[in-house]
């Protein structure tokens, strides 16, 4: 194979490797964004009203926001 053919194949290989590397970076950024969204949603679910906090404080528990509305519990998950 001529020197020019080897150079062309090398160039194609480098282009392919660079494109593959960029795809991996985009995938990693997408995964990182998805994790950040999950964290924000988790914190939003913990938003509770002062009334709930006062009611649970009497029972020495924390006010947790669930699908069915606020409730008192020793630990909040989610």
From Swiss-Prot:
- Alphabetically ordered keywords of this record: Amidation, Cleavage on pair of basic residues, Disulfide bond, Knottin, Neurotoxin, Secreted, Signal, Toxin
- Coiled-coil portions: none
In this UniProt entry, the residues modified to Phenylalanine amide are 77
Pro-sequence positions in this chain? 20-44
At the top level of its lineage, which domain of life is listed? Eukaryota
Signal peptide positions on this chain: 1-19
Q: Which GO CC terms are listed, alphabetically?
A: extracellular region
Q: Give the species.
A: Conus caracteristicus (Characteristic cone)
Tissue and organ expression note: Expressed by the venom duct.
Location of the protein in the cell: Secreted
- Chief site of localization: secreted
Q: Which family does it belong to?
A: Belongs to the conotoxin O3 superfamily.
Disulfide pairs? 52-64, 56-72, 63-76
An example Gene Ontology molecular-function term? ion channel inhibitor activity
The name on file for this protein is Conotoxin CaFr179
């Amino acid at each position: 194979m001529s020197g020019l053919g080897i150079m062309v194949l090398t160039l194609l290989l480098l282009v392919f490797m660079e494109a593959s590397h960029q795809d991996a970076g985009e995938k990693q950024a997408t995964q990182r964004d998805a994790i950040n969204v999950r964290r924000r949603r988790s914190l939003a679910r913990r938003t509770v009203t002062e009334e709930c906090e006062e009611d649970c404080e009497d029972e020495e528990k924390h006010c947790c926001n669930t699908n069915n509305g606020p409730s008192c519990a020793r630990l909040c998950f989610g």
